[in-house]
């Protein structure tokens, strides 16, 4: 339940796959609003990316517990066998959003207290983390893949770091584009989408690398060797046939 059949190598594979191969922003284009709005300066993009990664990691872990112990059909059986037939799955999305919104509010209070400059730089986009579809999408992706708890934590961390990496790279490029001779009709949104598309194509080059699946069975060649090997002769060579 907590680790399942996943090894440490599989956990590393899940992290790399969520960060690079299946980057939640560049492969599914979730969270594009804040990605485009808060990437004009590298410092602001870095702060927002760090916040999204933190919120996604913690809320992904909490929502996994919500799914398996509250909203999943039969999840309440751990409280009492009489509650095994209760199905609260219709409340799942609402509870996921409530958890994300609550933790976002906590993060907003902490940033206002300890990082006033970042709090002012993010502005209205900080409370909008609560409705950032990348966070809810990362949670739902992990739940639908039936990850155990630790792989879910690693997947949430990788998805958050992938979004963070994408917005930091994009902010770096946008700072360079500010001093470039971009055609007038492509300035602003046009060159931003072109740049994002080229970044997505670059990350697609890693497609095919997959070490995230658990190995629950022996390799095929081991099975073939076991089945093709000659069976030992159980009859003694000195045994004579019986007379009819």
From Swiss-Prot:
Membrane topology summary: Multi-pass membrane protein
GO cellular component labels: Gram-negative-bacterium-type cell wall; plasma membrane
EC number: 7.2.1.1
Protein location: Cell inner membrane
Catalytic activity: a ubiquinone + n Na(+)(in) + NADH + H(+) = a ubiquinol + n Na(+)(out) + NAD(+)
Sorted UniProt keywords: Cell inner membrane, Cell membrane, Ion transport, Membrane, NAD, Sodium, Sodium transport, Translocase, Transmembrane, Transmembrane helix, Transport, Ubiquinone
GO BP, sorted A to Z: respiratory electron transport chain; sodium ion transport
Superkingdom field: Bacteria
Chain intervals with Polar residues compositional bias: 222-236
Spans through the membrane: 11-31, 50-70, 90-110, 123-143, 153-173, 191-211
Function: NQR complex catalyzes the reduction of ubiquinone-1 to ubiquinol by two successive reactions, coupled with the transport of Na(+) ions from the cytoplasm to the periplasm. NqrA to NqrE are probably involved in the second step, the conversion of ubisemiquinone to ubiquinol.
Family in the record: Belongs to the NqrDE/RnfAE family.
Stated name of the protein: Na(+)-translocating NADH-quinone reductase subunit E
Source organism of the structure: Chlamydia trachomatis serovar D (strain ATCC VR-885 / DSM 19411 / UW-3/Cx)
């Amino acid at each position: 339940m907590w680790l399942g059949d996943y090894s440490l190598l599989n956990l590393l594979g899940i992290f790399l796959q969520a960060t690079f191969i299946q980057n939640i922003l560049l492969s599914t284009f979730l969270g594009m609003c804040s990605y485009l709005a808060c990437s004009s300066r590298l410092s602001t993009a870095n702060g927002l990316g760090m916040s999204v990664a933190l919120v996604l990691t913690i809320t992904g872990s909490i929502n996994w517990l919500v799914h398996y112990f509250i909203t999943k059909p039969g999840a309440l059986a751990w409280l009492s066998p009489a509650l095994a037939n209760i199905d609260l799955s219709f409340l799942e999305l609402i509870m996921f959003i409530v958890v994300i919104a609550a933790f976002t509010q906590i993060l907003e209070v902490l940033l206002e207290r300890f990082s006033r400059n970042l709090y002012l730089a993010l502005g209205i986009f900080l409370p909008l983390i609560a409705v950032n579809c990348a966070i809810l999408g990362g949670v739902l992706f992990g739940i639908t893949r039936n990850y155990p708890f630790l792989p879910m934590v690693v997947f949430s961390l990788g998805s958050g770091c992938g979004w963070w990496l994408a917005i930091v790279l994009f902010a770096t490029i946008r700072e360079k584009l500010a001093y470039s001779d971009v055609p007038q009709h492509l300035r602003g949104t046009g060159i931003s989408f072109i740049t994002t598309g080229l970044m997505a194509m670059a990350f697609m080059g890693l497609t095919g690398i997959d070490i995230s699946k658990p190995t629950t069975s022996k390799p095929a060649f081991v099975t073939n060797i076991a089945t093709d090997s000659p069976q030992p002769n159980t009859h003694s060579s000195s045994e004579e046939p019986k007379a009819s």
